[in-house]
Regions:
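A short acidic, Gly/Pro-enriched loop at the edge of an enzyme's catalytic core
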Residues: 105-113
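Class I SAM-dependent methyltransferase SAM/SAH-binding core
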Residues: 52, 58-99
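Short, conserved SAM-binding segment of the class I
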Residues: 133-140, 144
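A short SAM/SAH-binding and catalytic strip from SAM-dependent methyltransferases
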Residues: 112-131
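Class I S-adenosyl-L-methionine
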Residues: 161-214
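Conserved alpha-helix/loop element of class I SAM-dependent methyltransferases that forms part
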Residues: 32-48, 64
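N-terminal, positively charged/glycine-rich alpha-helical extensions of SAM-dependent methyltransferases
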Residues: 1-22
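Conserved beta-strand signature within the Rossmann-like core of class I S-adenosyl-L-methionine
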Residues: 145-154
Length: 214
């Protein structure tokens, strides 16, 4: 992602942070929506797994995991390009690792990589250019995941679209995933009417009896 796009993201969310404070609306997310989308990770968690929360915001996913999956003793890392989000998250969760992507980089792999709400703000003037960024970032995230990549998008099947919002069409996204990432994926379009998630599984090898490994 280029500096001008990172600057747009930083400016956009800092304005919301100034207006709303440390609340879901500062992330461009209505109250109550996060916990619903986070449920998509429930069946992926396993003992001692390493999780990367890409675009972590206020580390609300970590709050959810602690509340619902503490017994798995997972290792959480959050990262974001909005430095103020990282500062807030570090103060809230002093025992967890947070990466400010403006000054640090991701140097390891994770069992589960999530990206919630990351691609909802349109970074460019055209949808085509934004989708190029989506594909580039998905490739990076897929490469640092060991087992699962879980991402969400705003659905194209809506009654209206806000000015700077990005709604991902399914057909080009699926074609990209199948061709460049994995043939093992799930589309989850049943938990909210205006967004969907895609779970991409890293292991797409076929065994001798022509079945996917589990």
């Amino acid at each position: 992602m280029e500096k001008k796009q990172i600057s747009k993201i930083d400016n956009y969310y800092n304005k919301l942070l100034k207006i709303h404070g440390v609340k879901p609306h500062a992330l461009g997310c209505p109250k109550g929506r996060q916990s619903i989308r986070f449920k998509n990770i429930d069946n992926l968690i396993f003992k001692n797994c390493k999780i990367l929360d890409f675009g972590c915001g206020f580390a609300d996913l970590l709050n959810y995991l602690i509340k619902n999956h503490a017994s798995y003793k997972f290792k959480y890392t959050g990262c974001d390009v909005v430095s103020n989000f990282i500062k807030i998250s570090r103060n809230k969760h002093r025992g967890s690792k947070f990466i400010d992507l403006n000054s640090d980089s991701i140097n390891e792999k994770y069992d589960i990589v999530t990206a919630f709400g990351v691609f909802n703000l349109k970074y460019t003037k055209s949808n085509e250019d934004h989708f190029k960024i989506v594909k580039k970032e998905l490739s990076k995230l897929y490469n640092i995941s060991k087992k699962y990549l879980l991402i969400d998008f705003q659905s194209p099947f809506v009654d209206y679209k806000q000015k700077d919002s990005y709604h991902q069409h399914l057909d080009p996204l699926i074609k990209f995933i199948v061709k460049n990432l994995s043939r093992r994926f799930e589309i989850i379009h049943s938990y909210l009417p205006y967004e969907f998630s895609i779970l991409i599984r890293k292991d797409s090898q076929i065994t001798k009896n022509n079945q996917f490994k589990l």
